[in-house]
Amino acid sequence: MDTEYEQVNKPWNELYKETTLGNKLMVNVGMEDQEVPLLPSNFLTKVRVGLSGGYITMRRIRIKIIPLVSRKAGVSGKLYLRDISDTKGRKLHCTESLDLGREIRLTMQHLDFSVSTRSDVPIVFGFEELVSPFLEGRELFSISVKWQFGLSKNCYSLPQSKWKVMYQEDALKVLKPSKKKASKTGSSV
């Protein structure tokens, strides 16, 4: 799999305006290519790709991620691509450690993976192996951003037909309540 990625320095407000731009996925359905956008889940956007043929392959994925945390926090992590059709979550791809305080642009020319049109085989992108220089804040920055590809259990078209639905999910890991210390130090990031 050929992968290119870069990190960009821009003010956060400029990056926020671009949050819906640049995230695209080229899907090969049978003999045809279809380009679909990837949008954050809060846009409540789902893209329908008509099912035809036995398998769907994914190519030319372009993902732009705006900063997830403050640049001053110094949080870094690796972007993983996993097949989560089983409990092992087989790794399909992994980047080098990236600064989560900057914009990340990721381009993948081809995924060595096909999704059957008759089964539910989700593929997930997410940040793992997060590292923070602030020991107490490591769990605080356990933020995952996932792009999940899978079959929908519902019909989204009239007349009724089967559709492949692709959606992006933003998920915050639930922080476990920690034991309160007798004395707290007022440090913030």
From Swiss-Prot:
Main location class: host cell
Keyword list, A-Z: Host membrane, Host-virus interaction, Membrane, Phosphoprotein, RNA-binding, Transport, Viral movement protein
GO CC terms in record: host cell membrane; membrane; viral capsid
GO biological process, one term: transport of virus in host, cell to cell
Subunit structure: Interacts with host protein HFI22.
Family named by the database record: Belongs to the tombusvirus/aureusvirus movement protein p22 family.
Protein name: Movement protein
